[in-house]
Amino acid sequence: RNEFIAYGELESNKIDFTPGGAPLICYWQVPRDEAVTIRVTPPNAAYWAVEFGSYWWETMDYRYRLCSLNMHHAELEQDGSLLVVVSHEDPGLPNWLDPSGHDEGYVTFRWIGADDYPRPQVEQFPVSQLEERLPENAKRMSREERVEQLRQRRLGVVKRFGT
């Protein structure tokens, strides 16, 4: 739990390895009073994405909730690193993954056509310690910015699926 493993290292998943890529998966459990941070510096890549789902491998409601990131809408920190927070309440950070009422599930990082395949580092702690665990200059997001972020995501779904 809370450690990323490459798909190719899983005995049962040898056939699922992505040609030209290196997917990594992590099982998470986040009680309501805890948070998880995931940190990594993304490699130079043709594409990278973070996918988030329930224990049952269901995708979350990506039309109305923040349950995925990719190189186009993730906000990197000033040092080029990616800071992702998983918590049941909005932490006011741009790269929040919303568990959507679930207490456990999976998160997958996909590095496609990358020059390196870094493993994200995971920390879990009481949500009351979140502020002290963040970098001093961590990017923030206001309530208004979150509303706009969600609106833009919905527009993206409409453009893709026409619904």
Stretches with model-predicted labels:
Residues 1-163:
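A compositional/structural signature for long, glycine/proline-rich flexible linkers
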